[in-house]
């Protein structure tokens, strides 16, 4: 039986999602916990790999269950073996042709940016931080220029392994909640470091170093060296993949970020 899992995690202290030789990743922790419940090794595939320090409110992964277990075992049982900072929220049987990554038609990210002179204390590791005042309207105007299909090479990490830099951006927004700026992005897929590079560029525009039309120039030049530096991973949240309704997976729109930041 193929099983899909909904997972949330705090990326602080983990070396990203993807398993690596030295361990210390979210995937390593999840597979170890699944193995404890199953009694045999279990491998998982996820919807979107996250970097070190990046969080997730609704990561989705799937695996082929090697043994018969009730769904509660894949939630409560697995959670009892997971380290702090990682939790399975739900488990659901899916069709054999479901794939956490390839069945997704889009992905969503949110970036939380604390904008005040003092660095974060309570929110340390959970938000990005910028000390200089930012102009909301300028960043909102720049976001509009990101919508549609573009070559996002100017926002692509040098070691990005994506076959094509062309992606379709269906949502690019920024709003202000007190001294917190909330950036939301949804696209068919994202390049490595793409969201953090976009946020860094929007911050340059918000502080007045560049104008909103700088976005268009960067998209045209396709030169990563001309864009702003990559922003901190601390405030980045993978809010999950977007699937067609027929897969019957839970709605990811119930995470705490929606309730807090409206």
Swiss-Prot record:
InterPro entries registered for this protein in UniProt: PsdUridine_synth_cat_dom_sf, PsdUridine_synth_TruA, PsdUridine_synth_TruA_a/b_dom, PsdUridine_synth_TruA_C, TruA/RsuA/RluB/E/F_N
Enzyme class label: isomerase
Binding of substrate, residues: 109
Catalyzed reactions per annotation: uridine(38/39/40) in tRNA = pseudouridine(38/39/40) in tRNA
Molecular function GO labels: RNA binding; tRNA pseudouridine(38-40) synthase activity
Keywords: Isomerase, tRNA processing
EC number of this enzyme: 5.4.99.12
One GO term (biological process): tRNA pseudouridine synthesis
Matching Pfam families: PseudoU_synth_1 (PF01416)
Superkingdom to which the source organism belongs: Bacteria
Record note on quaternary structure: Homodimer.
Function per UniProt: Formation of pseudouridine at positions 38, 39 and 40 in the anticodon stem and loop of transfer RNAs.
PANTHER family xrefs: PSEUDOURIDYLATE SYNTHASE (PTHR11142), TRNA PSEUDOURIDINE SYNTHASE-LIKE 1 (PTHR11142:SF0)
HAMAP family (alphabetical): TruA
Family: Belongs to the tRNA pseudouridine synthase TruA family.
Protein name as annotated: tRNA pseudouridine synthase A
UniProt lineage: Bacteria, Pseudomonadati, Pseudomonadota, Betaproteobacteria, Rhodocyclales
Primary gene name: truA
């Amino acid at each position: 039986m193929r099983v899909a899992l909904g997972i949330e995690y705090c990326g602080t202290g983990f070396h990203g999602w993807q398993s690596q030789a030295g361990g210390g990743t979210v995937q390593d922790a999840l597979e170890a916990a699944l193995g404890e419940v199953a009694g045999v090794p279990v491998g998982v595939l996820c919807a979107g790999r996250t970097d070190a320090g990046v969080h997730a409110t609704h990561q989705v992964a799937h695996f082929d269950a090697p043994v018969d277990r009730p769904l509660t075992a894949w939630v409560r049982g697995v959670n009892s073996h997971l380290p702090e900072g990682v939790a399975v929220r739900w488990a659901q049987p899916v069709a054999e042709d479901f794939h956490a990554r390839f069945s997704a038609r889009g992905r969503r990210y949110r970036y939380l940016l604390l904008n005040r002179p003092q660095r974060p204390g309570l929110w340390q590791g959970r938000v990005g931080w910028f000390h200089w005042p930012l102009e909301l309207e300028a960043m909102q105007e720049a976001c509009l220029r990101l919508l549609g299909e573009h070559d996002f090479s100017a926002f692509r990490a040098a070691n990005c392994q994506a076959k094509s830099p062309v992606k379709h951006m269906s949502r690019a927004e920024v709003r202000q909640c007190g001294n917190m700026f909330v950036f939301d992005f949804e696209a068919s897929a994202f390049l490595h470091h793409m969201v953090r590079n976009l946020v860094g560029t929007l911050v340059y525009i918000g502080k007045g170093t560049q104008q909103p039309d700088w976005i268009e120039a960067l998209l045209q030049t396709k030169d990563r060296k001309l864009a702003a530096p990559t922003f901190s991973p601390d405030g980045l949240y993978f809010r999950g993949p977007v699937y067609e309704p027929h897969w019957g997976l839970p709605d990811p729109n119930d995470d705490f970020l929606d309730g807090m930041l409206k």
